[in-house]
Amino acid sequence: MQQADLTKRINELKLKRNAVILSHYYSRPEVQDIADFVGDSLALSQEAVRQDADVIVFCGVHFMGESAAILSPNKTVLLPEIDATCPMADMVNVEGLKILKEKHPEAPVVSYVNSSAAIKAESYICCTSANAVEVVNSLDADEVIFVPDKNLAAYVASRTDKKIIPWEGHCPTHHQILREDVLKMKEKHPRAEFIAHPECRPDVLELADHVASTRGMIVHAERSPAKEFIIGTECGLIHGLLKAVPEKTYYCVSEFACCPSMKMVNLEKVLTSLEKMQQRVIVPEDVRARAKEALDRMLAVKIN
C-alpha cells in the first residue's frame, strides 16, 4: 500500500475508533507526520491525560505505552510494535532496586520515566530529562536514589546539593555519542552551536553550548540567534527541528545516534494496530496504582 493510501486508511480508522496517535520525536518522520501530537516524554505523559479519545495509539517504546496506560486506565492504549523495548529501561530490575533501597532507607527513589511500570511502582517520584533537576530539588531529602540512567544522574548531581546515588544504566544510543564525534563536528561546522541531551556522557556534555530535553532543544533552536546546530541526541529529532524552525540548519552529531527500537514502528504497523486493536498495553492494577502515584507527583512539580 502506498504511503498516501496508508495515511488515508489510518485517518479513517482514527475517526471510527475515536483514536488519537501520539509519537515521540525519535520515531520515523512519516510516523511523526501522521501523529496528532509529537513530543518528548514529559509532554506525551501530559497529553495522554488530556486526551478524551477512547483509544491511544502510542508510537514509541514499551515504557511510553505503559505510562499512558498508568495515567489513563479507562483508555485503550495500543503499541503498534510490542517488541519495541527500551534497552536502558531493561537495565534496572525490581529485585536490585529493592536491595538498593534497603541500603539507603532514607533516600527516596527518583525513576526516570524511561523505566518499566514495575520500577515506577517502587519509586517515590518519576522524572523526565526536562524536569529531572526540578524533581530532585523538590524532595525533602539529603540523598536520592536515581534510576536507571547514570548519565542523567551525573547531570542532575552537577546541579543539586543533594547526594545522588545512581543506578549503573545508560541509553546505548546516547552513550555511543563520543567526545571525539563532537570535536570533529565542531571543527567541520565552527559556527554551529552544539546542543546535547543530558543522557549523553558527562565529557560530551562538557562541550555543549546548551543541554536540554528533546523539546528543550527545539525551544532553544527557536530562540537562539545561531543559524546552525550540531544535535547531540537521537537523529529523529532533526525532523521535528526542521518542522519547527525550517530556516536553520542541523547536523546529527554521529551516524550512530539512531535508536533501533524507536524506528521499529512504521505506518503499516500503525494501521494494523488500529485495524486489529492490538497490541494492548496492560498494567496490573496494583502496579498501576503505585506507579501512578509516582507519575502524579512528577506532574505536580513546577519546572522553570
From Swiss-Prot:
Cofactor note: Binds 1 [4Fe-4S] cluster per subunit.
Alphabetized UniProt keyword annotations: 4Fe-4S, Cytoplasm, Iron, Iron-sulfur, Metal-binding, Pyridine nucleotide biosynthesis, Transferase
Keyword Transmembrane helix in record: no
Catalytic activity as recorded in UniProt: iminosuccinate + dihydroxyacetone phosphate = quinolinate + phosphate + 2 H2O + H(+)
Subcellular location as annotated: Cytoplasm
One GO CC term, this protein: cytoplasm
EC class: transferase
Binding site for iminosuccinate: H24, S41, Y112, V113, N114, S129, H197, P198, E199, T214
CC cofactor: [4Fe-4S] cluster
Record: residues binding [4Fe-4S] cluster: C86, C171, C259
Predominant place of localization: cytoplasm
One example of a Gene Ontology biological process annotation: 'de novo' NAD biosynthetic process from L-aspartate
Pathway(s) this gene product operates in, as recorded in its UniProt entry: Cofactor biosynthesis; NAD(+) biosynthesis; quinolinate from iminoaspartate: step 1/1
Gene3D superfamilies reported for this sequence: NadA-like
GO molecular function: 4 iron, 4 sulfur cluster binding; metal ion binding; quinolinate synthetase A activity
Keyword Kinase: no
Matches recorded under NCBIfam families: nadA, PRK09375.1-2, PRK09375.1-4
UniProt function note: Catalyzes the condensation of iminoaspartate with dihydroxyacetone phosphate to form quinolinate.
Name of this protein: Quinolinate synthase
Organism: Methanosarcina mazei (strain ATCC BAA-159 / DSM 3647 / Goe1 / Go1 / JCM 11833 / OCM 88) (Methanosarcina frisia)
Annotated gene: nadA
